[in-house]
Regions:
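Catalytic-site microenvironment of enzymes
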Residues: 1-219
Length: 219
């Protein structure tokens, strides 16, 4: 069903509806280590994504502001109520061993049931490839999960864990605005790749947002 839905749509990003879900928010800050706070980092990245997507004609919906932290079920309701084309959840991780590091992307799937989101898996792979091609974050691969956010959203949904704040190198990267710009560009190019036909595709890590504009991908 998802494959058919995406194959008949225009490759243009204009008028697509993309929901961005930055984790935590408000008084609930999430992970915090090495001077970096999860809720602040992911919201800043969400805003960078939002600005770039709006410039490409996308309708963007954020599930929270800087000052609130909706329940997960409310975030899911937001995504479903706006008839989203895609949902992107942003998170960072932490672990007791500071050597843990890297980026991982999750999509809906249950290996025990043989069920997977076809578009979600493809999108997760595209995001993972683009981020790892443009940054030096360790590639922790893509994984199928049956978390509520992935399972209950109608649109293809991915969650990106963008590094470990408990790891000094990852935290230092994420604290840098230029690095967050790299992440934003990688995600946006991955979004466009999802709608490109195979003959229009380009080598991973080579497309830039300006290339998308020149190609007329905003109607």
């Amino acid at each position: 069903r998802e494959s058919v839905k995406h194959s008949v749509r225009s490759p243009a990003l204009a008028n697509k509806v993309i929901v961005i879900d930055p984790s935590w928010g408000g008084e609930f800050t999430g992970e915090s280590a090495n001077g970096v706070v999860e809720s602040e980092i992911v919201f800043d990245l969400a805003q960078r994504l939002e600005g770039r997507l709006i410039a490409l004609g996308v309708n963007v919906v954020l599930t929270r502001s800087a000052n609130n932290s909706p329940l997960e079920i409310d975030r899911i309701k937001v995504a479903n109520s706006v008839n989203a084309d895609l949902v992107i959840a942003l998170k960072v991780d932490s672990y007791k061993n500071e050597n843990a590091n890297g980026v991982a992307t999750y999509f809906y799937g249950r290996d025990d049931k043989g069920v997977r989101s076809v578009v979600g898996e493809r999108f997760a792979n595209l995001i993972q490839r683009e981020i790892c091609a443009r940054t030096d974050l360790l590639n922790c691969q893509t994984h199928a999960k049956s978390w509520d956010l992935l399972r209950l959203t109608v649109a293809p949904t991915v969650r990106i864990d963008l590094g470990y704040l408990s790891n000094p190198r990852d935290a230092k990267r994420l604290a840098t605005a230029a690095f967050r710009d790299q992440l934003a560009e990688a995600m946006i190019v991955a979004i466009q790749r999802l709608y490109l036909s195979a003959e229009d595709d380009a080598k991973t890590g080579t497309l830039k947002i300006s290339d998308l504009r020149r190609a007329g991908l905003r109607n």
